[in-house]
Amino acid sequence: MKKTPSPTDEETQLFRDAIKGTRKIKQDTIRADLRPVKQKRELRESREKLGVDHYFSDEYQPHLEADGPTRYVREDVSKFELKKLKRGSYPPEIYLDLHGMNQQQAKQELAALLTLCQKENIHVASVMHGIGKHILKQRIPSWLAQHPNVQAFHQAPREWGGDSAILVLLDIEE
């Protein structure tokens, strides 16, 4: 690299004449007001809560077949897609583990997962609810059936969680 030539005496004098009359800044630290950040965070949290409450109602009970594994297919989707999901033809691209979460936390995480899948164009997700007291195992299918982007879901094959997980096929807008 080339070295920058040092300024001549004439250039130095011109610079000093140009800044004549200026004074040193005593303190240049600017203290930003944190209120806008807090307002943005509160707005984002309220939007997230709205999304959870909008899609996932606890009162809604979809018609899910009681016999056999947990499964659902939207009316406008081919039942063949459900079979492919059951066989494991669609490997999950993302996993969500809900072990140890309460219903509200699980709802928020599920909403965040579906939003992320939409943003990242992810078509198949695995939601691991665990065995436990069967609370999440019963709630998650009813929540998923309410979401407009969920085409189908089926109890996961053994290699992806078996009884303690659900594979979800999503309808992602390109």
UniProtKB/Swiss-Prot annotation:
Gene3D superfamilies per UniProt: 3.30.1370.110
InterPro entries from the UniProt entry: Smr_dom (IPR002625), Smr_dom_sf (IPR036063), SmrB-like (IPR022990)
SUPFAM superfamilies, sorted: SMR domain-like
Cross-referenced Pfam families: Smr
UniProt keywords, alphabetically: Endonuclease, Hydrolase, Nuclease, RNA-binding, rRNA-binding
Enzyme Commission number: 3.1.-.-
GO biological processes: rescue of stalled ribosome
Top-rank taxon: Bacteria
Role noted for this protein: Acts as a ribosome collision sensor. Detects stalled/collided disomes (pairs of ribosomes where the leading ribosome is stalled and a second ribosome has collided with it) and endonucleolytically cleaves mRNA at the 5' boundary of the stalled ribosome. Stalled/collided disomes form a new interface (primarily via the 30S subunits) that binds SmrB. Cleaved mRNA becomes available for tmRNA ligation, leading to ribosomal subunit dissociation and rescue of stalled ribosomes.
Membership in a protein family: Belongs to the SmrB family.
PANTHER family the record matches: DNA ENDONUCLEASE SMRA-RELATED (PTHR35562), UPF0115 PROTEIN YFCN (PTHR35562:SF1)
Protein name (Swiss-Prot/TrEMBL): Ribosome rescue factor SmrB
Native species: Aeromonas hydrophila subsp. hydrophila (strain ATCC 7966 / DSM 30187 / BCRC 13018 / CCUG 14551 / JCM 1027 / KCTC 2358 / NCIMB 9240 / NCTC 8049)
Gene assigned in the entry: smrB
